[in-house]
Amino acid sequence: RGGFSMGSLSADASWCGRDVLAVDDLSDAMLGELFRTASRMRAMVASRGSTDALKGRVLANVFYEPSTRTMCSFDAAMKRLGGEVISVSESTSSAKKGETIEDTVRCLECYCDALVM
């Protein structure tokens, strides 16, 4: 029964603290490693139903526009991999009080490992 670790994704310093806003922000090598890691994670979840590969990690889903499928797919994937999810929408954020999206992101990145927008 082989375990899983984030391997070269987490060991590679080029991923640390990086903002990925578009696929063009990733090199071919990074994309290749990302897809290989995703494939291993998918196979693991398919064979076991879930895993704790991302236990202790927190994902923030930040959606200011309605998005059922995208938001739910990231939420389900993170939970199947053992992580936790914080969901933020415009109605639940401080945007209602005038906070900018940039300020919201700065705040969330202090206690989340990844943000999906």
Language model region names:
Residues 4-76:
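Positively charged, low-complexity intrinsically disordered leader regions
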Residues 58-112:
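Active-site cofactor/substrate anionic-group-binding motifs, chiefly glycine-
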